Amino acid sequence: YPSANILVTTKKDFDYPSANILVTTKKDFESHNRKKFCARIATGDYDAVIIGHSQFERIPISRERQERLLREQINEITDGIAEVEASGGERFTVKQLERTKKSLEARLEKLQAEGRKDDVITFEQLGVDRLFVDESHNYKNLFLYTKMRNVAGLSTTDAQKSSDMFAKCRYMDEITGSRGVVFATGTPVSNSMTELYTIQRYLQYERLQELNMTHFDCWASRFGETVTALELAPEGTGYRARTRFSKFFNLPELMNLFKEVADIKTADQLDLPTPEVEYHNIVAKPTEHQQDMVKALSERAAKVHSGTVDPSTDNMLKITSDGRKLGLDQRIINPMLPDEPGTKVNQCVDNILQIWRDGQPEKLTQLVFCDISTPQAAGSKKVAKTLDNPILHALEQAVPEPEKPLAFTVYEDIRQKLIAQGMPASQIAFIHEANTEVRKKELFSKVRSGQVRVLLGSTQKMGAGTNVQDLLVALHDLDCPWRPGDVGRILRTFKIKKNVEVTDNGKDDF
């Protein structure tokens, strides 16, 4: 059971109380314990092994299977190159495919050069006969090759963890007749249509082979369509025509094929006791400094498009990143700029305080999501080897080390403003402070009991597995969530019926 959630919570939720369950810990996968723990799985009589995603990825698939998978990918690209050349396709497309092929060949050579490690227990040796993957959308970046060019919406990123999962799914299909893998997710398609094809490759690979759709372009020609439309430019000024792979075609046939492996349940069908939600879209007017900075972003983008600036010096990724920071707070770009009233952060603080005061009798709690300007880790202090020397120790105490001023962060700014308005510091917490499973468990317990009333965190750290909804009444999005799975942490089942609020400060056109 690879899970992205807190593993102890997953064990408690297991439906069979008398089952013999093994739950992994971080210590189990430390370098000197990993082999022993894998042997324990292989030789033990367990009904289920609950394991974290990162730990699951550290159990290797056999070298022979990795080599076979890489050779299949190389052959697929070789066939694609031959097709493009035979049809008189663009030379640029051929070069792209050849670069990808060389990269895969280098990976294959490296794998072969590593040699065999006889002491490593592989996934095949564990004796696993079923694989249940929670939050399976974390494995959406599977290798994908296409002859399409200049088409947005095609996710071709190859993550090692996804390739590893694909190899393990193929193995499970072999030993179970394609009935050994179960994926669970609330967002099978988060930000790219290619993700549906990816799920089918994980769960329906043999079926795709029967239909001659193991190559993405064959699948896309039957079920996808490219659309050209005007879009707002990344720098936030003006529009541009953009072709995207963004529309499904032959949707009934696609859904019939997908439903061969998918059990789809919508919120209406489940009818769970979720709270009634009141949404607020808060608009913050840009300051004069922000308006001037947006003009500067536009000028930088024009130079990038014209090719007059070196990509290592400036590029659209940097410009977009600066635009996101600027959209949240101008002090992230320059801490010396003034803290002006009416900004996103100040409006958010006012909302938090009002809801905090209104919820005093019931100790109602709030979540604040912010993925930019997160808390910085305290600088590590170097300790001298001769620290136990009494003279040195006395000198160190007599001459205090000057403290470096902390860099500006939105998190700390919000905390200080809440404290200044009368909120006890003990009722405010950052998810980043809970850097171990034990601390995270304690923090969540405090939020559920109302001891911590405001919890700030990023989507990555406070997303999946954060079940603190007992007294939760409001959620604030300071920056715009990028994916559907990032939205709705407050929309969970409750033991008590109540109304909740979702405040979105996140829409930025820079």
Show where each model-derived region lies:
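SF2 helicase motor core recognition
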Residues: 52, 56-63, 125, 139-140, ...
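Conserved helicase motor "Helicase C" RecA-like lobe of SF1/SF2 P-loop NTPases
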Residues: 372-430
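Conserved helicase motor
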Residues: 9-11, 24-34, 52-58, 371-373, ...
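Inter-lobe coupling linker of SF2 helicases/translocases
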Residues: 8-10, 34-81, 86-130, 161-194, ...
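Conserved nucleic-acid-binding Ia/Ib motif block in the N-terminal RecA-like helicase ATPase lobe
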Residues: 1-9, 15-43
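Conserved RecA-like ASCE P-loop NTPase motor core of nucleic-acid helicases/translocases
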Residues: 364-372
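Conserved helicase ATPase core of P-loop NTP-dependent helicases/translocases
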Residues: 33, 37, 412-415, 419, ...
